[in-house]
């Protein structure tokens, strides 16, 4: 029996790159948190402390900022592809690279209906996600791209039921035909093509997710999530799979009867913990294997 | 020499009250985090453990939820006034009450341009604040109301200079005539009247703050903040004082010259810590004394 | 082509269970955050909103608290095993269960060298982790247990070098033979046996990890991590694999030469982001397959 | 009526200074988060954007690191005093300076009972606090120093009652003669002398606070807090006032009777929000005026 090195990766996490474009008086801005991880044979570093195959994480930091200039930053998927391919193609010991990106959206300030050229307010709503994985070189090169979002907090004040569930001796929940349903959605999706208008795809997927949450009369959060994933796949042929993780942000009806007050689903306590947590994948039955598409580095995607 | 009890207060912090209105198919929602603190002679509780003058914090929790039904929750200032007056007027040992509220805004989901009746997405931008303090009863009763906001992240990519500053042997900063200026603004303001349309006032003040940040060509964050406060006071005669606390969220130009790349204010590192922190009050020279308007309980306001 | 439901699980996350033992005047306390996830054929809930196979997450909450009484809570691994087996053995539709636990340690208050019977201070150092996965019933039942820790912040002020690394056009890092090395360690390990003294094993593994970090003269964080994992495996035959995730918490030497001051590795800026992030597995070459041991539900392990 | 500038201050917040001493093989380490604020007539900066009186916050950052070398960092109070006096004495426009410090404690790693020379684990328990305010120069100079701690989580599993409280129509709380009492203590104290052994004083005050929490049979958190403050004042003649802020971290008895289980104060749900929050000052009746001792800049103290 011997003790051996197993799977490993290393990189620079959470580079906070802000990129403006100022070729004209009307500036543009992109604001991201990017992490890069390199995979390959780094056993000498682990076993002997020999760094000769190790490109420093400091270099990866420099590269993240330099590529925001050299390659531009007009969509996080393209930027991530450029970075991942660079490491695999240009740095000899690197056999695979994983780039994970969070993007924070800004909205242009409007003054009397006119958009300001160079001032923005952070939108603050959901965080956009992307992850790019590239493995191998030349003809053997394979690429996986996922998009996503997190922290999209969405709520409906009716149109949600929960009853008919399995019971056991520990079950005390009262069935309901009308409840508040709310979640802080995490959704990621695997693109089966690289020939995608990333900006339009992101906006479109978000729109389908939100719209479906609103439109589906819900018998369970599970049912709503499946419909959300299904409708994304129906709308976008270049998406192979959608993964959803949805905490059930409980809104408990507050017992006001003790004070002689009726509470017809009007006053709730929004509780923190514990919370229900539903996770599901929705995919095409002919979807290509996900491979390392969802093998996370920092937990972003 | 004796050891004595000094100023004290107690209450229930961070009640997460969500209130819907569902009288018609088009529902409404308000989502708040409310804290109540009571002030008065509670020395028996401290000195002898005698609770006979102490209304439990659990009761304050119940009251926060009950008042969302009884009094409604159509503006946080009115709701806060109702709660504060209740404690001072109805609970004998209470001589003063402080209500602090954070409000989280939701925006209605739109489907094909039509607003949905009962589904919303958390806006996620700034958090609205209010604090109400009531002291004394009947003719001796005094009331202070402050409004505010926090977490409003705003940035301009040009139109900001910083030079001509004082130097000493520890000064290494390079003057600049063009930099990114960004902050996560906290602003609070003291209403000198209670006869205010709170919703309109909040929207208006936020608009003035954002607009002024955009419009003022900045020679220093201090200068921008003073103008922001000044224009709020000019626009709203019923506001006596504005207090601003603004972290300078540094965006450092990344040195790309090392890689043969020009960086003409295009690529920045958004740093976390440390950060400059500027705080200032702007007020009318005939402003009434602020009294306990800003004597915080939970640090919300 | 059809759209189908892929892998899914659901449960109640972050139940904050505190269990005291008070059979004698000297009380004991265990303080945990426990999440349970159920796996099985829940397609009816997703596809049709039919809950008849779904044990509510509310029931899982009740069960977490009830089992702290019924089964006791003397080690998180045994408690997790009892919960996981209960779901798989007693709830018919459940084919697999995953229990993830964080434990917060308390230390007894000492007064004049005498330990107090019923007062503790939260230790506050690392958080202990465990995850139990059970699949199948009767003879086909399989069980995986991992232990772990997170948030163990450890630093050495010398005995760490970093040089001889690969360079490319983006490399600007200066090699060093003496630097501060610090991390906030996450380590998890897979037990190949269930016949383990869990409390002793945890204390022992933590001790080996800390001791090895101190004793190894480091040429790279990678090398230190491999040694940490290797020595755990050498010391504990019932551990098959160790996984380590270590952010390099950078301590940058502050340039005091600008002020005529020498800085011989004495004054550092502890930076927040970005950070190097090294991840590695160390295992026996005859280790059993990890199976779902590390298939996380909440990201705890 | 004119609009004028009110009270203002500015500085550099949250400088993360780490200072090692390595004169001998046995190193020492101090790890702090320090903020400095300057007060004076900075109206030209606010009103006209004229920075000629403004020492940049970047300079304050440099100074914080430089002083960790020049003045050393053997106690945060002495380091804070040196910084504050420097700004007031050496920088002409500065009339007052406020230095706020958080300190994170490290404990030396022990290997087989022998302390390691240069490896530590972050203790992780409470955060130590200090704030220094200096106003005026030469004979007119006044100085205030407060010490403190935060995040000290302490719990007793019995020895706490709560009954006999005031009731009103919203009161539903059940009185109890035996409950868990827990808090995450914030305590700050005002030193009436500068001739203090700061390290011994801090350790002593913490010890009195913890011991008193344990020893007092509690009829209310208020009563416990008053005793904690009183005993600190009795023990340390050079402390004039103690301020305590204590969230009541509720541990709710879980209703296990529904499952046929007895719960004799053994199984609790540790709730997050809302929480009771008790704040009180305990002082000598001849205490000097606190002046600006507690006028916070960053909310640290």
Provide a role label for each language-model segment.
Chain A
Residues 1-301:
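N-terminal intrinsically disordered, cationic/polar leader segments
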């Amino acid at each position: 029996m011997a003790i051996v090195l197993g799977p490993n990766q290393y990189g620079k996490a959470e580079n906070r790159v802000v990129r403006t474009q100022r070729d004209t008086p009307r500036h543009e801005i992109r604001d991201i948190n990017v992490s890069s991880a390199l995979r390959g044979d780094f056993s000498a570093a682990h076993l002997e402390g020999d760094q000769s195959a190790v490109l420093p994480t400091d270099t990866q930091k420099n590269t993240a900022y330099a590529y925001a200039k050299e390659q531009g930053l007009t969509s996080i998927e393209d930027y991530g592809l450029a970075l991942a391919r660079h490491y695999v193609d240009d740095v000899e010991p690197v056999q695979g690279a994983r780039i994970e990106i969070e993007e924070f959206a800004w909205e242009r300030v409007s003054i009397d209906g006119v958009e300001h050229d160079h001032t923005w307010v952070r939108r603050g709503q959901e965080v956009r996600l992307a992850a790019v994985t590239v493995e191998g070189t030349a003809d053997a090169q394979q690429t996986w791209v996922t998009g996503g979002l997190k922290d999209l907090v969405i709520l409906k004040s009716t149109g949600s039921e929960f009853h008919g569930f399995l019971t056991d001796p520990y079950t005390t929940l009262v069935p309901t035909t009308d409840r508040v349903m709310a979640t802080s959605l995490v959704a990621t999706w695997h693109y089966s093509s690289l020939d995608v208008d990333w900006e339009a795809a992101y906006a479109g997927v978000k729109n389908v997710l939100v719209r479906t949450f609103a439109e589906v009369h819900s018998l369970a959060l599970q049912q709503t999530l499946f419909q959300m994933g299904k409708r994304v796949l129906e709308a976008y042929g270049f998406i192979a799979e959608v993964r959803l993780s949805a905490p059930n942000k409980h809104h408990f009806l507050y017992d006001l009867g003790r004070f002689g007050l009726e509470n017809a689903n009007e006053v709730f306590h929004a509780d923190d913990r514990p919370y229900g947590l539903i996770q599901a994948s929705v995919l095409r039955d002919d979807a290509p294997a996900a491979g390392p598409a969802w093998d996370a580095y920092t937990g972003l995607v």
